[in-house]
């Protein structure tokens, strides 16, 4: 049966292409709908007015009449749709009016006739569709439908194909989800019928790569079902050439040699200070890299005390990585030598490739890399750091603080911001990697590696685009259950689908699709650079929450209000404090304080009050996370608060009780030192802000849910 439907649709699409068209007519759309069991109303194509009258009489009751022309895509704009036509006289009038309007709209349009369609009962209008996204490929969409769809833009997206549960989840992912369940006396619609329409559309576009867009708008949803009043199918002008892909084992093998090399060659190494080749050599040597370092320069015998080689092919033994520090015009010939030498990875620092319009030059090096099996990092990058190997293969400032955060950036400027942030906050990193033009190696390769790397506890990535969104999603889904993945997607205000031929295409702006697909993959999306860096720094510090109950303990009522707002803004839940727990908190706070949630201990309390309430919050198993609001007083100075909090948290950790604890410190400049101390002792703390600590806690909760741990 499945093969039969594919053959039927294949025959139709081939005929459409043979006629030089990319848009299917309504009758052709019905053939596709019938093949994939997409529910549509009864309809017929009338080639003259008498046929229209006969078809309308057969359907009984009012009908909808629509122009059928391969040259008129938006029928309503052409005056080619009349709804609620009833009776032979009105059918005749409507038929002639539609033809007349179509001629006025486009005098050269080919008119095949008028579609006579059963008028569907009133119901909730929704849209079901699919587009071919340049990053993620086939993507299915769902949202509120009708003429306001492009105004409201209440739409959600998933990778196609979707299974029934994924399709059903889309109904709860729009802002107006409750409308489908019935509001103000309106009945609930048949949600499973809508989900089936979504699933079948996703199967259709997955079976036929040449289908660029499918639009069911509107779909009329009622308690009895969901029927597409209109179906539009648009074919792509051409199908893009598939890019070369690598298997997981291939990726891990090459990435292991890149991130844990035993031997590195520097092509373009130099004795002259100020040269990139000199900076790379100095960083490798001064950083303490224990592997072999081979300078390559045809004009030198010795570079920084190391024997220099005329060509990389002269280097003895096996080489894992070749770092290029030569002008772009010389890269291709040197890469040929790297390929003949059998080197696994080429780190291409030079600029002057696709980013400057030299696409052919970049295509040339990619072809060389593929021919020899050399993976390319870059070009147009600052290099990379692999701290656990004491490897600093870059011409920028060195960094050697080891830790659990892996950071990548597509931009060199962002890479240096990462470096400065890490140094300022004393953040330990496992790696910092520049991706630049991403001619070959990209985020999914790095995700695959960092997901398996025992030294990496959190991955944060700045990206401007993804070469292969599906490969990224696959890598993210494999990684997220093990460790958080944070993404900062730049360019979120991009215009999107400018030349879309359907409602769905117009709705599928770049960022709208990225937002839903990244969420589907379990990725934590950071709204800005600072948030990405703070999430990366803080998430490995926080233990995984074991439940949703959050309690705020604060010394300042104003902070408590702001912290409560932040909890709600981040999709978290303040615990309803039961009477016995309320009574326990009240034993430690003054009569003019406030229990409940937040627990307001007031600002003039001594350290013992902070300690007692924090202990109670950690001790009670019904509380899952603590948010602390500190107010600087002479009674309890910042470092006193920091030390007692760190001590109590450490004590409970030793007892096997670990809960996320974040803190907001308001006060004079001493709170900055206190926050750094708390961070270093397992409590995520920030000065002068109530939003940031709760945002980090919210990110931890989002990861825990995506990883299936909560």
Protein language model features and the residues they cover:
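Catalytic-core regions of core metabolic enzymes
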Residues: 1-710
């Amino acid at each position: 049966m499945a093969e039969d439907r594919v053959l039927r649709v294949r025959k139709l699409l081939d005929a459409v292409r043979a006629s030089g068209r990319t848009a299917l007519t309504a009758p052709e759309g019905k053939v596709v709908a019938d093949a994939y069991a997409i529910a549509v109303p009864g309809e017929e194509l009338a080639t003259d007015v008498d046929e229209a009258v006969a078809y309308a009489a057969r359907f009984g009751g009012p009908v909808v009449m629509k122009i059928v022309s391969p040259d008129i895509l938006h029928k309503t704009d052409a005056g080619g749709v009349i709804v609620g036509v009833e009776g032979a006289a009105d059918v005749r009038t409507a038929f002639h009016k539609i033809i007349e309007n179509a001629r006025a709209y486009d005098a050269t349009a080919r008119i095949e006739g008028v579609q006579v369609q059963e008028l569907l009962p009133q119901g909730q209008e929704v849209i079901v569709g699919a587009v071919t996204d340049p990053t993620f490929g086939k993507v299915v969409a769902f949202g509120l439908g009708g003429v306001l769809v492009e105004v409201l833009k209440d739409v959600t997206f998933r990778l196609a194909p979707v299974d029934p549960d994924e399709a059903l989840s889309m109904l709860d992912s729009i802002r107006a989800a409750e409308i489908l369940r019935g509001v103000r006396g309106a009945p609930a619609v048949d949600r499973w019928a809508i989900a089936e329409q979504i699933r079948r559309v996703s199967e259709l576009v997955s079976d036929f790569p040449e289908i660029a867009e499918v639009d069911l708008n509107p779909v009329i949803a009622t308690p009895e079902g969901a029927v597409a009043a209109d179906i539009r199918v648009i074919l792509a002008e051409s199908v893009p050439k598939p890019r070369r892909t690598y298997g997981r084992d291939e990726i891990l093998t090459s990435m292991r040699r890149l991130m844990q090399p035993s031997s590195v060659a520097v092509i373009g190494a130099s004795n002259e200070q100020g040269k990139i080749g000199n900076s790379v050599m100095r960083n490798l040597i001064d950083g303490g890299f224990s592997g072999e370092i081979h300078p390559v320069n045809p004009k030198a015998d010795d570079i920084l005390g190391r024997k220099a080689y005329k060509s990389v092919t002269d280097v003895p033994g096996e080489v894992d990585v070749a770092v290029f520090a030569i002008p772009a015009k010389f890269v291709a010939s040197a890469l040929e030598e790297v390929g003949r030498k059998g080197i696994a990875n080429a780190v291409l620092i030079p600029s002057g490739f696709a980013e400057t319009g030299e696409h052919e030059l970049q295509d040339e090096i990619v072809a060389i890399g593929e021919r020899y099996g050399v993976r390319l990092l870059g070009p147009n990058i600052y290099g990379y750091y692999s701290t656990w190997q004491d490897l600093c293969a870059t011409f920028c400032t060195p960094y050697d603080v080891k830790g659990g955060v892996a950071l990548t950036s597509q931009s060199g400027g962002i890479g240096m911001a990462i470096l400065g942030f890490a140094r300022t906050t004393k953040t330990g990193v496992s790696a910092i990697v520049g991706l630049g033009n991403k001619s070959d190696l990209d985020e999914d390769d790095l995700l695959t590696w960092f997901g398996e790397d025992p030294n990496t506890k959190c991955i944060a990535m700045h990206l401007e685009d993804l070469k292969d969104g599906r490969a990224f999603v696959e890598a993210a889904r494999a990684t997220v259950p093990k460790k958080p993945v944070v993404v900062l997607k730049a360019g979120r205000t991009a215009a999107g689908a400018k030349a879309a031929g359907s409602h769905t295409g117009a709705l599928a702006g770049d960022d709208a699709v990225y937002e839903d697909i990244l969420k589907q993959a379990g990725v934590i999306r950071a709204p800005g650079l600072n948030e990405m860096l703070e999430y990366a720094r803080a998430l490995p510090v926080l233990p995984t929450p074991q439940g949703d109950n959050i309690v705020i303990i604060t010394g300042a009522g104003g902070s408590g209000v702001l912290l409560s707002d932040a909890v709600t803004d981040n999709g978290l839940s303040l615990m309803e404090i039961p009477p016995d727990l309320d009574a326990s908190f009240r034993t430690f706070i003054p009569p003019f304080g406030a229990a409940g949630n937040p627990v307001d201990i007031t600002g003039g309390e001594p350290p013992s009050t902070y300690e007692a309430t924090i202990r109670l919050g950690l001790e009670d198993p019904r509380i899952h996370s603590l948010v602390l609001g500190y107010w600087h007083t002479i009674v309890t100075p910042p470092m006193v608060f920091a030390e007692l909090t760190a001590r109590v948290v450490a004590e409970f950790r030793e007892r096997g009780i670990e809960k996320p604890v974040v803190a907001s410190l308001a006060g004079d400049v001493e709170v900055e030192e206190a926050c750094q101390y708390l961070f270093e002792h397992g409590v995520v703390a920030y000065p002068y802000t109530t939003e940031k600590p709760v945002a980090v806690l919210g990110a931890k909760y989002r990861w825990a849910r995506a990883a299936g741990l909560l």
